[in-house]
């Protein structure tokens, strides 16, 4: 990233074309009070250079992307939002790699050499129709640079989908991003064509060819010509040429309106006397009246053709970012207050004038502090990224703002929810209740974060989780709460619980795929390189997901050539199931399915040297149970014979299948034994039992294990996992070998088990020079697991092994560290050096916190491994 001075002084070009504004100039003499460093500049950006394996088989095979983005519609088309906290933590401006994306279809392939001659036409009701190429646009028109927030009309739609399924796919609350856009004003382009008097609308059309034609929409001509509206064409974002997903090489940017009006890959501006008749303008981006059901909208197209229901300006909206969804606040280590913070925005250039927070269900409100970073550009006059920043005269607001408020911890303890609402300068206020509509767009009720008190902590929950099931709305609905009763589903006195709607079965088949596959073809195409597998009689090709699978390629390879219905359905989320149509290739005929069952039956009862098999389950018998503490056990299982070893590579895990004691349904989870990999005849599992509490249901698997009688059998299968330690600093990650000189091991609770496996392998080999630092976080001293072994390894060689324990509820006699695994602790013991790897396993909140801190400290994503 260039320094501030470099950004503001070097000449700028776009794809080799020099901009009209020429060399960059800064007019400091007019604004003596403004320092260059006061202007928000883009965050550090690292453009992806490799196409993700998940995209290689798709029409977007040419588009490198950031793997952190959350895919909302499976593999293709590409519709994503960034993780909410990552988006917020980047600051006012968003890097291109984290900028949200809404694509209706394939991204047009635009080669570098074609860009200077990229053409757009200005036609329709004009006196002088024009065709301009990219060079013309850069060289013949004044260039401006302005900060603008784009927001998808579907932002927060998942909340509507929980209440009642809409026709739109689910978005969380991160469907927005902000950038510095550079290019000419649309008005200047249109004036060149001399619009006729009867022209009322500007219809825009992109180069993305879709099933119903090219994507197009329209805005009013008087908006495009109004300098206060700031509507422009852009060829740069944050000083970089547009990337493919964001409209390379040219797009429209319509501030204050929904993102769907900012057409990407722009090819046409057509002036008309009526709104666009493009299919995507009519059947998308509308808020139909709430009484219109999906069935009504499908049977009567007149609902869609009424332009009164079209969306243009954004409405007022806000969201909480901190506390995060699923964040857990330990009251023992918490400070006197918590800084609640988030974002807000409005539409049509209107300023957010207040953000209010309530802790008593809306009976009383307090004002949050608001930061308007956009205003800093109004005090600056100069050129930035090849465009003039000239906002001192303009009072319209086109960007999000950040808000915050310190709330005393006792106040959070005494409430069950945080409510947030915003108001703009037109006194438009976020409503308390949701306005459900058939497309689920413009969802903007008060943002509510629930607080659950349990075991000395406060657990926070957002309305939904964009990555899968979760959030207080789903929880309340499953418990029989009526989410539209005006009380967020809370039952009032005398109110009976409602019967929750049956959960809709997710379709895992690709529409239009009618191919019948027999056993011979299935076996022929079921290899490590091309793993075909079966779920519920349907055939899937997992090749494209070998590299991207969170459990490692082996998880898919182990499924090759077999029916994995039971384990797939038991362990995969709704999000994972929704991805399956992208890999669906056909249906297996019934005769072949029956033959496959027999084909996959165990072939031999001959004793094996190793216990685990990657493609079939093997039974182990519970022979011993040792209580480590009131809620932690070591379960010892007998293998098939006394000389048999487990066969689990160091750093990997195995799947365990147990029948639910009540429903008898299979429960499948992954575990890492604490027994030595060379131990013969038995294996030991260290398990923390999650018992039922008055507010939280206990862990299904751990409760099932707790109820196992001696002599009971479990099923085991494996190995699985992306990581393997080979010894002497050599590791395999997703099949790729590398060398490290040290491990920084971060764990909490039973997350010690995979960490312990690697540590033991290093310490047992006296010739292994790899050093290890273990940061082990727990609540109380009795919760520290494997402590005797950890202390013994440190005593054996303190230079090779260092163990740091930290407790959140330490007794007065405790002489070790106190508190959570914090930023200070990681700065002290986990400094990035380019030769180390961080291994992490523990509660989700701990893992998320550690990941955020480590990335901020300079660790690369590829140097972090989460078990």
Swiss-Prot record:
Keywords recorded for this protein, A-Z: Disulfide bond, FAD, Flavoprotein, Heme, Iron, Metal-binding, Molybdenum, NADP, Nitrate assimilation, Oxidoreductase
* Single biological process term from Gene Ontology: nitric oxide biosynthetic process
Cofactor binding annotation: Binds 1 FAD. Binds 1 heme group. The heme group is called cytochrome b-557.
What EC number(s) does this enzyme carry? 1.7.1.3
Entry binding sites for Mo-molybdopterin: 152
Q: Which residues bind heme?
A: 549, 572
UniProt lists the family membership as follows: Belongs to the nitrate reductase family.
**Name of the protein described by the UniProt record:** Nitrate reductase [NADPH]
Q: Species name for this entry?
A: Aspergillus niger
Q: Which gene encodes it?
A: niaD
């Amino acid at each position: 990233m260039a320094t501030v001075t470099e950004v503001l002084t070097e000449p700028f070009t776009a794809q080799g074309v020099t901009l009209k504004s020429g060399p960059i100039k800064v007019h400091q003499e007019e604004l003596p009070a403004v320092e260059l460093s006061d202007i928000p500049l883009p965050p550090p950006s690292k453009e992806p250079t490799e196409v993700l394996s998940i995209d290689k088989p798709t029409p977007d095979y040419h588009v490198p992307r950031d793997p952190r983005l959350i895919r909302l519609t499976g593999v293709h088309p590409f519709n994503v939002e960034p993780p909410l906290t990552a988006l917020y933590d980047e600051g006012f401006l968003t890097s291109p790699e984290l900028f949200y994306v809404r694509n209706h279809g394939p991204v047009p392939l635009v080669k570098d050499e074609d860009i200077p001659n990229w053409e757009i036409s200005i036609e329709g009701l004009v006196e002088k129709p024009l065709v301009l190429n990219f060079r013309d646009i850069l060289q013949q028109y004044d260039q401006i640079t302005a900060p603008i927030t784009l927001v998808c009309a579907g932002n927060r739609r998942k909340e509507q989908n929980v209440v009642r399924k809409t026709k739109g796919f689910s978005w969380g609350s991160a469907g927005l991003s902000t950038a510095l856009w550079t290019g000419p004003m649309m008005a200047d382009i249109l004036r060149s064509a001399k619009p006729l008097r009867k022209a009322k609308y500007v219809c825009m059309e992109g180069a993305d060819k879709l099933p119903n034609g090219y994507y197009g929409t329209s805005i009013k001509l008087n908006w495009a010509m109004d300098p206060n509206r700031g509507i422009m064409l852009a060829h740069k974002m944050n000083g970089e040429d547009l990337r493919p997903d964001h409209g390379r090489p040219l797009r429209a940017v319509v501030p204050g309106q929904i993102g769907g009006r900012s057409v990407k890959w722009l090819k046409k501006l057509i002036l008309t006397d009526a709104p666009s008749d493009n299919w995507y303008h009519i059947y998308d981006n509308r808020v139909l009246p709430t009484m219109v059901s999906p069935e009504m909208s499908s049977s009567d197209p007149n609902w869609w053709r009424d332009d009164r229901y079209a969306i243009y300006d954004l409405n007022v909206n806000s969201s909480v970012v901190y506390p995060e969804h699923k964040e857990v606040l330990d009251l023992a280590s918490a400070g006197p207050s918590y800084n609640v913070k988030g974002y807000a925005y409005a539409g049509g250039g209107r300023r957010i004038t207040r953000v209010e927070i309530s802790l008593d269900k809306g009976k009383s409100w307090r004002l949050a502090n608001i930061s308007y970073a956009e205003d800093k550009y109004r005090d600056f006059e100069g050129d930035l990224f090849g465009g003039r920043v000239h906002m001192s005269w303009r009072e319209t607001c086109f960007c999000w703002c950040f808000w915050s408020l310190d709330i005393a911890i006792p106040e959070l303890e005494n409430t069950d929810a945080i409510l947030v609402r915003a108001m703009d300068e037109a006194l438009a206020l976020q409503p308390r209740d949701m306005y459900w509509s058939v497309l689920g767009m413009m969802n903007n009720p008060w943002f509510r974060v629930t607080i659950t008190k349990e075991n000395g902590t406060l657990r926070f929950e957002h309305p939904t989780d964009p990555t899968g099931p979760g959030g207080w709305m789903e929880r309340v609905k499953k418990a029989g709460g009526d989410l539209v009763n005006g009380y967020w589903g809370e039952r009032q006195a005398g109110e009976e619980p409602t019967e929750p709607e049956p959960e809709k079965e997710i379709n895992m088949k690709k529409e239009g795929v009618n191919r019948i596959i027999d056993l011979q073809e299935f076996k022929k195409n079921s290899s490590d390189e091309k793993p075909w597998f079966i779920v519920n009689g349907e055939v899937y090709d997992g090749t494209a997901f070998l590299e991207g699978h969170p459990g490692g390629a082996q998880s898919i390879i182990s499924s090759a050539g077999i029916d994995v219905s039971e384990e797939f359905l038991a362990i995969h989320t709704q999000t994972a199931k929704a991805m399956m149509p992208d890999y669906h290739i056909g249906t297996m005929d019934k005769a072949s399915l029956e033959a496959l069952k027999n084909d996959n039956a165990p072939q031999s009862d001959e004793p094996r040297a190793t216990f685990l098999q990657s493609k079939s389950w093997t039974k182990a018998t519970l022979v011993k149970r040792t209580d480590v503490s009131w809620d932690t056990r070591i379960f010892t299982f007998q293998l098939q014979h006394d000389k048999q070893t487990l066969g689990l590579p160091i750093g990997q895990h195995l799947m365990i299948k147990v029948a639910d004691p009540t429903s008898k349904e299979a429960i499948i989870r992954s575990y890492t034994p604490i027994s030595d990999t060379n131990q013969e005849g038995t294996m030991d599992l260290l398990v923390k039992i999650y018992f039922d509490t008055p507010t939280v249901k206990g862990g299904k698997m751990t409760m099932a294990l707790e109820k196992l009688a001696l002599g009971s059998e479990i099923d085991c299968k494996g190995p699985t996992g992306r990581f393997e330690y080979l010894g002497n600093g050599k590791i395999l990650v997703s099949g790729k070998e590398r060398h490290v000189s040290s491990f920084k091991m971060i764990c909490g609770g039973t997350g010690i088990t995979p960490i312990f496996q690697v540590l033991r392998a290093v310490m047992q080999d006296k010739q292994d020079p790899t050093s290890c630092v273990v940061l082990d976080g727990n609540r109380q001293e009795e919760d520290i697991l494997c402590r005797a072994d950890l202390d013994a390894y440190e005593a054996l060689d303190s230079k090779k092994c260092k163990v740091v324990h930290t407790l959140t509820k330490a007794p007065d006699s405790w002489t070790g560290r106190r508190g959570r695994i914090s930023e200070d602790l990681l700065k002290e013991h986990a400094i990035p050096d380019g030769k180390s790897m961080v291994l992490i396993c523990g509660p989700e909140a701990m893992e998320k916190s550690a990941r955020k801190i480590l990335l901020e400290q300079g660790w690369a994503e590829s140097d972090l491994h989460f078990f």
